[in-house]
A protein has these predicted regions:
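Compact, glycine-rich, soluble single-domain proteins
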Residues: 7-99
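Acidic/glycine-rich phosphate/pyrophosphate-binding loops and surrounding catalytic core
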Residues: 84-134
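N-terminal export/targeting signal detector
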Residues: 1-5, 9, 133
Length: 134
C-alpha cells in the first residue's frame, strides 16, 4: 500500500511525523479514512478513536477535537488531545467516567455542570474504548 506524509501536532507538541499508509479519524461529519493521494480536504475533528497504520503496524489513539487537513498529498492532524492507547491510564479514565456519571445522576447539577459532565463522560468512554480495542 502506498504511503503518505502524516504529521500529528497537539498543543503539547509533535506526536508523530512520518509516513503512514492509512489514517482513520472521527470528524464532526463522521469517520473518514485518509489514504495516499487523497484529495485536498479540511474537516473539524470530533471525539473518537484514531487509527494509524504505518509500516504494516496499526496503532490506535483517543483523538479529541481539533482539525484535519490534507493538502498536496500530506496530512496534518491538529487535535486538541491525542493519546496513544498504550499511554492511556485506564483507571484514570474509569474514575473520570464515574465522577461524570455521579454528576449526571445527582439531580442537582446546573446546566453548565451537566454539559461539562457529559463531555467528560464522552472523553472517558472514548479512552476506555481505545484501550479495549483489539
Amino acid at each position: 500500500m502506498m504511503a503518505f506524509k502524516l504529521k500529528i501536532v497537539t498543543p503539547d507538541g509533535l506526536i508523530y511525523d512520518g509516513e503512514a499508509e492509512k489514517l482513520i479519524v472521527r470528524t464532526s461529519g463522521g469517520d473518514v479514512c485518509i489514504l495516499a493521494r487523497h484529495m485536498d480536504y479540511v474537516a473539524p475533528l470530533g471525539m473518537g478513536m484514531a487509527i494509524v497504520e504505518a509500516n504494516g503496524k496499526r496503532r490506535t489513539a483517543a483523538c479529541i477535537g481539533g482539525m484535519l487537513s490534507v493538502s498536496g498529498g500530506e496530512c496534518t492532524l491538529v487535535p486538541t488531545t491525542f493519546e496513544w492507547s498504550d499511554k492511556i491510564d485506564l483507571s484514570r479514565a474509569e474514575a473520570s467516567y464515574d465522577r461524570a456519571h455521579k454528576v449526571l445522576n445527582s439531580g442537582s447539577a446546573s446546566d453548565t455542570e451537566i454539559a461539562l459532565a457529559q463531555a467528560r463522560l464522552h472523553r472517558a468512554l472514548v479512552r476506555k474504548s481505545v484501550v479495549s480495542f483489539k
